[in-house]
Regions:
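Extracytosolic ligand-binding ectodomains
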Residues: 1-226
Length: 226
């Protein structure tokens, strides 16, 4: 889903958790700013007070000054729109160390096992939202990933897998690695008619295309292009 949809869903969850006021910090790039803008508008539409909206830079060793700014504005929680291995993690660490916040609203880029491995029960009051699929492909992808020793729970793991698979299939369908050829064939391999291709079946799809057959790539996320 788009950031617009993701921000709205995160705001809906915030309302459901009975949060009355929230401070927002976002990673200082287009992803962070765009999602923060959508989230702010959506929570305010729910009657939730936004106490402050501030950017943070990734790659810093210490985020105590950023957290001090957030804490001075206050809020029942702080929404951390960023990355779990970058500044977002630092914001959480500094918040817990200072006692400024103990409830964190987490964007999709903040959700992953490494965060819970690091903070454990300190995140018990926290919540977030992550795009995903509940179709057949999602279950197949989880099994395939686990068999390969890969964590399938990270943000956009299935989407990344599908993107790579679609490019490979489009290259096979067009007989070329040329960008124009890929763009011309990617819709055909992602849509019906054709044999459905699920995670772990890339070779099957390539073999069918080599024989002049049609494929309909479902993948991990139920891919369909219009």
């Amino acid at each position: 889903p788009s950031d617009a949809r993701g921000g709205q869903i995160l705001a809906d969850v915030t309302k459901d958790r009975k949060i009355k006021s929230v401070a927002i910090t976002y990673t200082n790039n287009d992803y962070g700013k765009g999602l923060a803008d959508v989230y702010k508008a959506a929570v305010e539409a729910h009657g939730i007070k936004v106490t402050t909206v501030t950017a943070h830079e990734d790659g810093k060793a210490d985020y105590s000054s950023e957290v001090a700014t957030l804490a001075s504005a206050g809020g029942d929680a702080v929404a951390v729109i960023g990355y779990l291995d970058q500044g977002g993690k630092g914001i959480i660490q500094a918040s817990l160390d200072s006692g400024a916040f103990d409830t964190f609203v987490l964007s999709d880029g903040m959700i992953g096992d490494s965060l819970t491995d690091t903070f454990g029960k300190d995140l018990d009051k926290s919540f977030g939202s992550l795009p995903g699929s509940t179709g057949k492909g999602a279950g197949v992808f989880k099994s395939v990933a686990e068999a390969a020793g890969i964590d399938s729970s990270g943000p956009y793991t299935g989407e990344s897998y599908d993107a790579a698979a679609l490019i490979i299939l489009a290259m096979q369908a067009g007989g070329s690695a040329d960008r124009t050829s890929i763009s011309q064939n990617i819709i055909d391999v992602a849509n019906s008619p054709g044999t459905k291709i699920y995670p772990g079946e890339l070779k099957k799809g390539l073999d069918l295309l080599a024989k002049g057959k049609k494929v309909d790539y479902e993948g991990a996320t139920g891919v369909t292009f219009t």
